[in-house]
Amino acid sequence: MATTTVSPGSPGAAWRRVGAFCLDVLFPPVCGGCGRVGVLLCPACVVRLVPVAGPICLCCGRALDRAADIAGGLCRDCAATPPLLAQMRAPLRYAEPASSLIHRLKYEGCFALGPALAGVLIDGWPRWPSPPDLIVPIPLHPRRRRQRGYNQSELLARPLAAAVGVGYSATALQ
């Protein structure tokens, strides 16, 4: 996915703002969580997003609820078979409205939700126990990438890495 950088004060940036305004008038954004017209992620749905909190697996980021797991710092799965990646994090529990937002991003082609969800990741960044050296989107199978036309995890990982000042690589896992 190629990106073009346009300086904020340039004529190109002004035309992009005009174009975005026209698109919003013709096709107003709709909240991915509840369908409210006018915004991609409404304040009511943002409030309903449940962050992963409390003790989490130091490897995969899954919530730990057993005393034995909490003491060891790893969930049962990671203790039995450690993943190839050193750290993975899920900032939200996969419950409504997060599950609807992710479904719309992945399967309904609503890639405009990418920046809104990336904002949720950026807001949750201070809760992450240790910052990684590199942020890497999970690659899609080439056939799936052709079908969708984009990798939804890239839409989240790239702006997160830029906002928090951590390196980014779309090809590290390929």
Language-model-detected regions and their locations in the chain:
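Glycine-rich phosphate/pyrophosphate-handling loop used in enzymes and phosphotransfer proteins
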Residues: 1-174
